């Protein structure tokens, strides 16, 4: 998928290439569930992945359900968060793609909490906290 913002049938995806030269893209998205909750997820996908393959790769979706509709603002915040923890993701994944999902977003303090689940470690969850200051505040005002 190309870098950008996708919106199709109440599914929102933001796609961004990773900087590791492995032809992978980081995708963060949200899907409305039948219960009117939102399934918010992130994952590392091959750059040639299609919209349908992302949406049908259930193994990649580790949900955090929320009643709050996701906004472009908080999805972009979550995506930017991964810039700061990208290396940590690869360290924990031992070279394999990690599954990441949003555990919580605190827009006032511009923090995004994510959980990383790695295949080689049996999907053991670990919490990573990422905090930002100036660049995130600029982004926050722009969106």
Task: Walk through the language-model features, giving the residues of each.
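Non-catalytic substrate-recognition and accessory regions of acyl/acetyltransferase enzymes
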Residues: 1-143
């Amino acid at each position: 998928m190309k870098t950008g913002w996708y919106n199709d049938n109440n599914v929102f995806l933001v796609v961004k290439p990773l900087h590791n030269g492995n032809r992978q893209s980081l995708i963060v998205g949200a899907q409305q569930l039948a219960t009117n909750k939102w399934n918010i997820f992130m994952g590392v996908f091959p750059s040639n992945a299609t919209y349908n393959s992302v949406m049908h790769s259930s193994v990649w979706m580790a949900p955090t359900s929320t009643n709050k509709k996701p906004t472009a603002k908080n999805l972009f915040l979550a995506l930017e968060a991964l810039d700061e923890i990208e290396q940590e993701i690869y360290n924990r994944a031992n070279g394999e793609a990690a599954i990441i999902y949003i555990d919580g977003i605190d827009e006032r303090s511009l923090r995004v909490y994510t959980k990383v689940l790695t295949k080689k470690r049996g999907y053991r969850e670990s919490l990573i906290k990422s905090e930002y200051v100036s660049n995130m505040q600029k982004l926050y005002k722009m969106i």
